[in-house]
Amino acid sequence: WYSSMFAANIKQEPMSHHHHHSHHHGHHHMLQHSNSNRNASSPRQSPLPSPNPPSSSNLHLEQYLKQQHQQHQQQQQQPMDTLCAAAMTPSPSNNDQNSPLTPPGLPNPMQIIMPANMRPATQPTPTIATPTTTSSAIVALQTNDKLQALTPPMDVTPPKSPAKSQQSCAEPEKDHDLISNSSEDMKYMA
């Protein structure tokens, strides 16, 4: 019922897409601005060895910005989900008095939320806020999926090799720790 809600909200609220687009554009511009400031400050700090360090620092900044941007998306996605749930839950809770079948859950909330979303459009301020937040969250989720689908091949593949090496190193370390602990325990026991 999430997908049906999202599709219904997106169809009902075309304005929300424009609003989120402008917000996303501003956020992206902010990232570019911070990146330009860092690049401008790095050569000032090290003017003489400028040829090599800027390249490494730029690569590091790009990876750092990508990771930070991805983490920000993930952090943003969690509250978005909570916002969606919070925005969806009030409408069935309000309709609990009218329809006692809401508690069972998935099918009924869908039937109830659909007219509930149609009703808010008539009321001016409070209820329009909920569909816009949900629809903007939906657009954000879609954009996050697109961005994550594009970025992971670059960001995720390098960490895999160190992660594997860390796991492989960690496994014998754990075994060694267990063995040493057990032997020490045996010594203490003896």
UniProtKB/Swiss-Prot annotation:
Composition skew (Polar residues), residue ranges: 90-100
GO terms for cellular component: nucleus
Predominant cellular place of this UniProt entry's protein: nucleus
Molecular function as annotated in GO: DNA binding; zinc ion binding
Protein purpose: Gap class segmentation protein that controls development of head structures.
Family: Belongs to the hunchback C2H2-type zinc-finger protein family.
Ranges of biased composition (kind: Basic and acidic residues): 171-190
Compartmental location: Nucleus
One of the GO BP terms on file: segmentation
Keyword annotations of the record: Developmental protein, DNA-binding, Gap protein, Metal-binding, Nucleus, Repeat, Zinc, Zinc-finger
Name of the protein: Protein hunchback
Origin: domain of life: Eukaryota
Biological source species: Scaptomyza crassifemur
UniProt keyword annotation of Kinase present: no
Positions with biased composition (Basic residues): 17-31
Lineage: Eukaryota, Metazoa, Ecdysozoa, Arthropoda, Hexapoda
Annotated segments matching region Disordered: 13-59, 86-110, 142-190
